[in-house]
UniProtKB/Swiss-Prot annotation:
It is found in: Host nucleus. One of its GO terms (cellular component) is host cell nucleus. Residues 190-321 are annotated as: Disordered. Its main location: host cell. This is Regulatory protein E2. Gene3D superfamilies: 3.30.70.330, E2 (early) protein, N terminal domain, subdomain 1 (1.10.287.30), Papillomavirus E2 early protein domain (2.170.200.10). GO terms for molecular function: DNA binding; DNA-binding transcription factor activity; nucleotide binding.
Amino acid sequence: MSAAKEQLLAAQETQMTLIEKDSTDLKDHIDSWGPVRREHGLLYAARHKGLIWLGLNPVPPCSVKCLEARQAIEMQLLGNSLKESPWCNEPWSLCDLSWGRYQAPPAETLKKGARLVEVEYDGSSTNKTWYTAWNSLYLRKPDEEGWETATGGADADGLFYTTMSGTRVYYELFERDAARYSTTGTWTVRDNDRTYHSHSAPSHSRETIEGLWNSGGRERGRPTNSPDRAVLHTPPGGNTVHGPVRACENRGRSINRPTPYSTPQSPRSGVGPDTTSPLPSPVPQNPRCVSLPDGFGRGEEDNPPSPDQHDVIPNPQPKEPRFSLFGSSGGLPCLLISGTGNQVKCYSFRVKRWHRDKYHHCTTTWWAVGEQGSERPGDATVIVTFKDQSQRSMFLQQVPLPPGMSAHGVTMTVDF
């Protein structure tokens, strides 16, 4: 299995090099999926032979590696196909050709230029949610080889993209979420500097929403001059793609969603009732609840202080001592652990997780600075510090060093 370990290490090292390159060239991202596929294939073969570890890497079940290997193959073939299209020379980031973005709504499309679309229900500033819209989308042509581009947008109905032929395809409908989280069936959409208001309150008794479907799982859109009827998008698996995750699905309780940015608390003109105005309260039935003049029949015991009236001061946490390589007057015992970038990063992760009590501090992975660009001459290195010589000796005895790595003991002293 030594050959398999070397091949796995080489595949992981190639992946790290391409990730740190931060390239915008499509060819580099196509090449990055090759070592990913080899890594999953090696781990699949290792698990098939009954191994649960391959070097320092745990071996997942065969079903997991088989699925991830197929995903890598699909993305590599997708990139090779895109390389033959007119958009091959555009700047492409590693995220643009990632599996997660490829499967994000609308599924099985490449996307660029994400932006947030805010939807406010019932005119309430506390009843909001956000969706992700895309400026540009790239789709495989269903009936012929090749690619076509589309522009993303949003309106009062939902999120959509418009193809080169003028067909508008909706992949997210706000009406469905309004039926669950809105009491009046109205909402306001804000997309950058554009604002849209919902149409008349939808009928929630309708069981289905009309749509056009084809056998490939991708919906057929409608021309832009056709009547407003949204097309519901369903991925090939059959499960309807929902919008963002919501923290509460009970409309009887207040809905507080985390905001991706700070919003002013001033009232806005929106559709629906004004939720900021207080509602008239019923006449209390308990005589103790009747408002009395100040100083009449009230004592200090009747009005206990509210927690909101006092500042909560947390107990101060003791500050950890600041890390320094030269903190010890007699010299700080250290170890210089060197190897390839992947080896050193895996090693530092492992000792931090399983042997944290056996050393004092550990630095991040570092290299020497090259003469040009992002060149990194020499091996990757981490510095592990210890409180005294005995702790370092015990660390060397109890923590094994993987093959191919080296450890050098040094003592940090200050000359001036």
